[in-house]
Amino acid sequence: IKASNGNGFYYAVSSAMLGLPVASKAIKVVMEDESFPKTASIIRAIWLAGFPEYARLEAFKRIREMTSSDILALSKLDTYLAIRLATRKYGYGSLVYSAVAFPKPYRDIVERASNTYGISPALIYAVMRQESLFDTYAISVAGAKGLMQLLDGTAQYVARREGIRIKNLFHPETNILLGVAYLRYLLDMWNGDLVRALASYNAGPTRVKDWNSTEDVYLFIETVPIAETRNYVKRVLYNYYVYSDLLK
């Protein structure tokens, strides 16, 4: 039943097991020209007048009247705003209008990080989408920062290991490179076990070492004692399956 609702972790796993494309329900949205649709034009005018925060508030007030073309147009103005609108309107895991809900920003940086650390762009985008919804200036309650949501201590540790200078942790290139380097470190720690690496990215490797030692990855996921981490792993894996299809 859980696998049949058209999106989410169980849907992605069952589709992959059957050799079916996870993103088969994705609908491609194409703007017919470069002009902004009516509602998007109003938001854009407010934004360009120098009131980006008011523009964001106005966008959410008008979300019911927005079409997919409006949201796609706004993605050219602010990726973070567009994906928040898309996930609010269609749901976090919805494959409808995937060009908006599953964007691929910072392609050059992601490709470089992928080549440097041997991690697929699909996985990098999957983590980034869950961590920050592509908000460059995101800050969590715990103090994690940027696109890949790195704590200062973690960022400094990885920077020393990799010889990366941290001028600004909110800088996309710095944040992505450090986040991918840390993910590589965790994957190596767990001998390539993606599920435990993702759990460690969220909850820390020390905690994960104390959890279920089963080799059954699905049993491990379902027995993760922290609900936030359990849901985090499922969402990142779902994102990963979707991006793997979209990037083919």
Task: Label each region the model flagged.
Residues K2, N7-L18, Y54, A59-K248:
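Catalytic glycan-binding domains that act on GlcNAc-containing polysaccharides
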Residues L20-K25:
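Short, solvent-exposed, mixed-charge loop/turn linkers that connect secondary-structure elements
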Residues A26-P37, Y97-A101:
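TPR-adjacent "capping" and linker segments in tetratricopeptide-repeat scaffold/adaptor proteins
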Residues V30-E32, P37-S41, T67, N168, ...:
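Alpha-helix initiation/capping motif
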Residues E34-S41, G50, P105, L178:
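Alpha-helix N-cap/N′ positions at the starts of helices
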Residues K38-K61:
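Alpha-helical segment of the N-proximal tetratricopeptide repeat
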